[in-house]
Amino acid sequence: MNAATSGIQLNAQTLSQQPAMNTPLIHRSFRDDYTGLVSAGDGLYKRKLKVPSTTRCNKFKWCSIGWSIGALIIFLVYKLEKPHVQPTSNGNLSLIEPEKLVSESQLIQKILNATTPQTTTPEIPSSTEPQELVTEILNTTTPQTTTPEIPSSTEPQELVTEIPSSTEPQEEIFSIFKSPKPEEPGGINSIPQYEQESNNVEDEPPPNKPEEEEDHDNQPLEERHTVPILGDVIIRNKTIIIDGGNETIIIKP
């Protein structure tokens, strides 16, 4: 106590020798942990010589946290660098080859394959090509339209109208003719000029009819053939051409 009081007195003397103090005086009789000063009760202060207990606790707390983090890091490094061992049937430990170790990605992939359901896609048979498959699908979806078949008995030739034979009576052939119509020059049924000239020449009676020729007027009625003709008659090389306007008939001997 004497030393403490003497120290306080010395400090009081040194402070009294200094000029007037402008700092406010805090009259406290307990220790101030924040400023580190001890009040003497008379307005004078003294520096603390010892670290307060709260500061020591704070330092220990942070030190313990730092040491625990460092120990954890060292343990992890040692664990990772330690060789992988596995027990054998004899109880001894043997090293595992690095190739046999399963990586994390492979392990995750195996777990996913085991949990996710396997979806199977339908396989297309190799025999059926894509084009054949498309045609089969179209045949199944589109309605089948059947075309009516023409019977084989009806041939085109049977449908053609037959031309009347020469044995039929001539009157029935010429009865279908109509009255001749005036044809325009250059039309389809127009007669060429040289045929008209020959027709005009033949229509004229011969000037001198020889008596040696047969007289058709004196022939019996059974041998005569009288046919009503409505149209132009052309005789060329023993062939009779009858132009009835709409139709033309050719009679050969």
Swiss-Prot record:
Primary localisation category: host cell
Coiled coil regions in record: none
Topology of this chain in the membrane: Single-pass membrane protein
Composition bias type Acidic residues, residue spans: 200-216
Record's keyword terms, sorted: Host membrane, Membrane, Transmembrane, Transmembrane helix
Membrane-spanning ranges: 62-78
Region (Disordered), start-end ranges: 141-225
Compartments, record wording: Host membrane
Biased segments, Low complexity type: 141-158
GO cellular component, one term: membrane
Protein name in the entry: Uncharacterized protein 037L
